[in-house]
From Swiss-Prot:
GO-annotated molecular function: DNA binding; DNA-directed RNA polymerase activity; protein dimerization activity
Stretches the record annotates as Alpha C-terminal domain (alpha-CTD): 246-326
Record note on quaternary structure: Homodimer. The RNAP catalytic core consists of 2 alpha, 1 beta, 1 beta' and 1 omega subunit. When a sigma factor is associated with the core the holoenzyme is formed, which can initiate transcription.
Primary gene name: rpoA
Family annotation (InterPro entries): DNA-dir_RNA_pol_insert, DNA-dir_RNA_pol_RpoA/D/Rpb3, DNA-dir_RpoA, RBP11-like, RNAP_asu_C, RNApol_insert_sf
Organism: Ruthia magnifica subsp. Calyptogena magnifica
Organism lineage: Bacteria, Pseudomonadati, Pseudomonadota, Gammaproteobacteria, Candidatus Pseudothioglobaceae
Enzyme class per UniProt: transferase
Protein's UniProt name: DNA-directed RNA polymerase subunit alpha
Amino acid sequence: MQGSARNFLKPKLVESSQTGVNEFKVILEPLERGFGHTLGNALRRTLLSSMTGSAVTEVAIDGVMHEFSTIEGVQEDVLDILLNLKEVSVMLNTAETAQVVIEKKGPCEITVADIEANGIDITAFNPDKVIATINDESHMRMTLKISTGIGYDTATSRTDEASSIGGMQLDASFSPIRRVSFTVDAARVKQKVNLDKLNITIETNGSVNAEVAIKRAAIILQEQLSSFVELELVEEEEALPTSEDFDPQLLAAVDELELTVRSANCLKAEQIYYIGDLIQKSEQDLLRTPNLGRKSLNEIKEVLTEKGLNLATSIENWPPVDLMSE
């Protein structure tokens, strides 16, 4: 079986070119028949959903308390400004989160280039993007929170996070990939025909080039597939652990932690029913849970600490077989 796998053709990068503003075309060939669509679909989905990037997640504008306000002397209303901020293309090169300021006196246009980094290592990729227009001599100051993340994050998923006074949460598209499409053409190597050639077109926000993006996507897929390479059959005679092999505290339902209704419902929605399930989750795992924010996370950590337990605890052979069957 291993020997036959080595006989498969391995594709090579035969072309990488820029076809437009932040648009790239990559061609890989030859691939075994059918692998063009198999790998093309996998890479496309991974590129669109799993690339790391930065985005504006919160803004506080001096004198503005909510998104339905208007600002005297400013052409755009606050909702339009928020929409413009969602299109800001930046990258935090070192920090996970950072606060930056834009402060201008009109009349003028406020663009991404007006962001004051104040020593923060940040790169802007659409500096000419207009955020707001001041029509008179009015003064405008806004504080932006920029965060690093993966995929798409709605403002409602961060309702538990502490906001600055007057801070307005934004839906954030962290992905540096705007669009991915692919086609599969016929290829040939010597006398071997019916092979595939994979043509991938990628449009980015300018923060990453196509080759780097594909490499990152391939690494993600490789890491996910590595578990399948190392699959081992469980011997039938091997005794599976039962509840008697675990600390009774781990077998208790999360309801016994007496968490707030919000926190408890978030855990149940993620099928976290037992304390043993919960303590194996890391802080990052829980923060990715919809509607579970920092406040709920701190509550969970405090309750677990009172019981001498901590998050990110590995439990070998969990869950017990009789617990799974309940």
